[in-house]
A protein has these predicted regions:
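Accessory interaction regions appended to the cores of large information-processing enzymes
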Residues: 1-221, 225
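Single conserved hydrophobic/aromatic residue that forms the stacking wall/gate
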Residues: 222-242
């Protein structure tokens, strides 16, 4: 419900005008805002414009993975006068190119799922558990003592947990008991991001290097691409950490 969404955003500190202009707010926190003023045919074109936006949110430019927590402001629209040239097949590709270029200009990053972990071990095994977590890019956040048992609370990237049972039991002589739960999406360390992007793209049959913003921006004076002859979209993207 549009009114309900407006009230929710206002309760989170958004100003009334911006909250009213939200065109789409998807389940992964991606937002498209109508920032245009006095432009014709916006209402009848919105579904086609949002189609391109949604396509990019499903397969982002870095590795064709889902996008999270991005806000786009749709700032300009020069529609074709002929209704036949303002359809889905014309506007959706133009919207997609604008969103891809905006994302790449904003220097997007990869996010990875971070898990919370609680480990119960004898007190003399605390160091062993800390070693396991640190060796898997995790860390200890808190420790409590209950009788002879130490309860260690920490976090660990989901991608590092595939052999956690074998490693944890090996380090604690089988005395550790633990459970994990999803905690948050967190930025992936830059030291491993580039290699992961390249590996993921290769696995999907893509070139190892992600595209650049220039590949989606028409810089010719005549604007001979579909961005001129059909529609011209300019989007500004801000990456926001929740």
């Amino acid at each position: 419900d549009k009114k309900e969404m407006e009230n929710l955003l206002k309760s989170k500190g958004w100003d009334t005008d911006t909250a009213k202009r939200v065109m789409r707010f998807d389940s992964r926190g991606n937002i498209m805002i109508n920032g245009t003023k006095g432009v014709q045919f916006i209402q009848e074109s919105s579904d086609s414009i949002l189609s391109g936006f949604e396509e990019v949110m499903k397969e982002g430019p870095l590795a064709k993975e889902q996008v999270r927590n991005c806000k786009f402001t749709f700032t300009h629209f020069v529609p074709h006068e002929d209704t036949a040239h303002r359809g889905l097949s014309q506007l959706s590709p133009a919207s997609r190119r604008a969103c891809m270029a905006a994302m790449l200009k904003a220097n997007p990053i990869l996010l990875e799922p971070m898990l919370g972990i609680e480990v119960r071990v004898p007190q003399d095994m605390i160091g062993n558990v800390a070693t396991v977590l640190s060796g898997k890019r995790g860390k200890v956040l808190d420790m409590q003592q209950k009788g002879v048992t130490s309860i260690i609370t920490g976090e660990i990237p989901a991608s590092e947990t595939f052999d956690i049972s074998e490693v944890m039991r090996g380090q604690t002589a089988g005395k550790a008991m633990w459970n994990t739960h999803f905690k948050a999406w967190t930025p992936m360390p830059k030291s491993i991001q580039a290699n992961l992007i390249a590996d993921t793209r290769k696995r999907k049959g893509l070139s190892p290097e992600p595209p650049t913003a220039d590949e989606f921006i028409d810089r010719s004076e005549e604007h001979t691409s579909e961005l001129q002859s059909l529609a011209y979209l300019v989007c500004r993207l801000l990456l926001e950490k929740k």
